[in-house]
């Protein structure tokens, strides 16, 4: 499974500025999901190699504001 890293409280994606390989995204994805990968895609952190139950953006009933 893959998807955008999401803040479970706000429903917002984790933003990033350096597209492609990105240490911040990799660190955040691994911190939240263990052995996942991560990079910056469309100015948000995209996590790879997630388990199927991983929670990713968008969250039901939560809009980012």
UniProtKB/Swiss-Prot annotation:
Key words of the record: Disulfide bond, Ion channel impairing toxin, Neurotoxin, Secreted, Toxin, Voltage-gated sodium channel impairing toxin
Classification via SMART domains: Knot1
Recorded GO MF terms: sodium channel inhibitor activity; toxin activity
Superkingdom field: Eukaryota
Record-linked Pfam families: Toxin_3
Organs and tissues of expression: Expressed by the venom gland.
CDD domains membership: neurotoxins_LC_scorpion (cd23106)
Any GO BP annotation: defense response
Bilayer-spanning residue ranges: none
GO CC, one annotated term: extracellular region
Disulfides per UniProt: 12-64, 16-40, 25-45, 29-47
Residue intervals of the LCN-type CS-alpha/beta domain: 1-65
Protein family membership: Belongs to the long (4 C-C) scorpion toxin superfamily. Sodium channel inhibitor family. Beta subfamily.
Free-text function comment from the UniProt entry: Beta toxins bind voltage-independently at site-4 of sodium channels (Nav) and shift the voltage of activation toward more negative potentials thereby affecting sodium channel activation and promoting spontaneous and repetitive firing. Highly potent.
Name of the protein in question: Toxin CsEM1
Protein's organism: Centruroides sculpturatus
């Amino acid at each position: 499974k893959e998807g955008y890293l999401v803040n479970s409280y706000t429903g917002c994606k984790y933003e990033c500025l350096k597209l492609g390989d990105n240490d911040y995204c990799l660190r955040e994805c691994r911190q939240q999901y263990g052995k996942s990968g991560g990079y910056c895609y469309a100015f948000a952190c995209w996590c790879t190699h997630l388990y199927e139950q991983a929670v990713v953006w968008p969250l039901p009933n939560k809009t980012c504001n």
